[in-house]
C-alpha cells in the first residue's frame, strides 16, 4: 500500500506521536482492518498499518473521518521528528487531487468548510496549486452552495483568483455580490484586528472581464460596490499606520486611476456599451485624442467609433474634418459616420477622392462621388 496511485479511491491518514494515542484508543484492534469510533457512537471501517504509520480509509467514509479529525484537530505535525517523517501533506495532496479529477463536490465542500480551516500545517510544496485547482473548478461545479462554501472559506488574502473564477463561470449577479460581500467582511475583520496584511483584490482585472462580455450592468455594479467599500472606510477609527494601508486600497478601488487601460481594453473588444458608460461618467475623456481616434478607425471598431463621435467630438468640427482627410484608406462605415457628424465633404471630399485614387481604394472613390453628387 506504499505505492499511492493518484486515482485509487481511498484516503490515507498519517499517525504521528502527536495523535497516536488518541487515534489508537478509538480502534477496535491494534492493527489491520478494524472499526474506528468517531463521535456520537458513529463507527467506520479502516485499516491501520502501524509499522508504516498510516490509516487507510475508504472514500465512502472519508467525509465522516475528515469531519472527526478536523473537529478534534487530530493532525500529525511532526515534519522530521524522532517518531517518523510525516507524510500528512502528501496524503492530503493525493486526496485533493483525486476529488478534483473526479469532480466530487461533496468532498470538495468538506475540504473547504472543515479541513482547510483546521489543518494549520497545510504548507506542503504543492498545496497552493491544489487549492487553486479546487477554486478553478468553480466554473464547472453544479452546486451554488458549494461555490458559496468555497467563497466563505477562501484561504488567501489575494482575492483575484476567486473573482476571476466566479465571473468566468458566468455567475449571476447574486453570486458576484456574495463574493464581494465575503471579501468586504474579511477586509473589515482584518482592519479591526489590526492585521499587517489586508486582503486585496485586482479591481482592474475584474472590470476587464466585464469589458470582454460588454456587460455594462455588471461593470457598473462592481464599480459601485467597491466605491461603497471605499466610502465605508471613512467611518473607521484607525491609527496612522492603518490609514496608510487603507489609503493604498482606496486608490486600487478608484477605477478612474486606470481608466485609460479600461478604455484601451474596451476598444480592443469593441465594447461600445462600456465606452459609452465611461464617457457618461466623465472618466478618461482625455484618452480620445487624434491618435487614439485614428487607431479606432484603423481597427474598424465601428460601434465604438460612433459612440465617441456622438459623445465626445461631435462638436469638434476641426477634429472631424482632420479625421475625414485621413479616411481615404478606411472602411466605408467610418467615412459615412464622419459625414453624418458633419465632415465637410464639399470642401475636403475631392482631396479624399484624390488620395483614395492614388492608393487604389476604388470603393471609397465611388462612395464619395455619390455623396458629393447628391446621389
Swiss-Prot record:
Family: Belongs to the mimivirus L17x/L18x family.
Protein name, UniProt field: Uncharacterized protein L697
Amino acid at each position: 500500500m506504499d505505492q499511492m496511485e493518484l486515482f485509487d479511491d481511498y484516503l490515507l491518514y498519517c499517525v504521528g506521536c502527536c495523535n497516536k494515542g488518541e487515534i489508537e484508543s478509538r480502534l477496535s484492534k491494534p492493527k489491520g482492518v478494524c472499526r474506528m469510533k468517531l463521535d456520537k457512537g458513529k463507527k467506520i471501517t479502516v485499516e491501520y498499518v502501524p509499522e508504516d504509520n498510516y490509516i487507510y480509509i475508504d472514500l465512502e467514509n472519508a467525509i465522516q473521518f475528515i469531519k472527526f479529525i478536523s473537529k478534534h484537530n487530530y493532525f500529525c505535525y511532526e515534519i522530521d521528528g524522532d517518531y517518523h517523517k510525516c507524510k500528512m501533506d502528501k496524503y492530503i495532496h493525493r486526496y485533493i487531487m483525486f476529488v478534483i479529477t473526479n469532480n466530487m463536490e461533496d468532498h470538495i465542500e468538506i475540504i473547504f468548510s472543515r479541513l482547510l480551516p483546521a489543518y494549520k500545517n497545510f504548507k506542503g510544496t504543492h498545496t497552493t496549486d491544489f487549492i487553486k485547482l479546487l477554486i478553478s473548478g468553480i466554473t464547472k461545479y453544479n452546486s451554488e452552495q458549494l461555490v458559496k462554501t468555497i467563497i466563505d472559506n477562501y484561504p488567501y488574502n489575494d482575492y483575484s483568483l476567486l473573482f476571476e473564477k466566479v465571473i468566468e463561470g458566468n455567475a449571476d449577479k447574486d453570486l458576484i455580490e456574495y463574493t464581494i460581500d465575503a471579501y468586504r467582511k474579511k477586509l473589515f475583520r482584518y482592519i479591526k484586528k489590526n492585521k499587517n496584511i489586508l486582503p486585496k483584490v485586482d479591481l482592474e482585472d475584474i472590470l476587464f472581464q466585464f469589458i470582454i462580455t460588454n456587460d455594462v450592468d455588471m461593470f457598473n455594479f462592481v464599480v459601485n460596490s467597491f466605491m461603497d467599500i471605499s466610502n465605508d472606510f471613512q467611518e473607521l477609527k484607525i491609527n496612522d499606520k492603518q490609514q496608510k494601508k487603507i489609503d493604498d486600497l482606496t486608490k486600487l478601488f478608484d477605477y478612474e486611476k486606470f481608466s485609460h487601460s479600461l478604455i484601451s481594453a474596451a476598444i480592443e473588444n469593441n465594447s461600445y456599451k462600456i465606452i459609452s458608460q465611461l464617457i457618461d461618467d466623465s472618466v478618461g475623456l482625455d484618452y480620445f485624442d487624434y491618435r487614439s481616434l485614428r487607431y479606432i478607425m484603423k481597427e474598424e471598431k465601428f460601434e465604438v467609433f460612433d459612440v465617441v463621435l456622438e459623445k465626445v467630438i461631435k462638436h469638434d468640427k476641426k477634429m472631424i474634418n482632420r479625421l475625414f482627410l485621413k479616411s481615404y484608406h478606411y472602411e466605408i462605415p467610418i467615412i459615412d459616420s464622419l459625414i453624418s457628424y458633419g465632415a465637410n465633404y464639399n470642401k475636403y471630399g475631392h482631396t479624399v477622392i484624390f488620395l483614395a485614387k492614388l492608393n487604389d481604394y476604388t470603393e471609397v472613390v465611388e462612395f464619395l462621388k455619390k455623396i458629393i453628387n447628391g446621389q
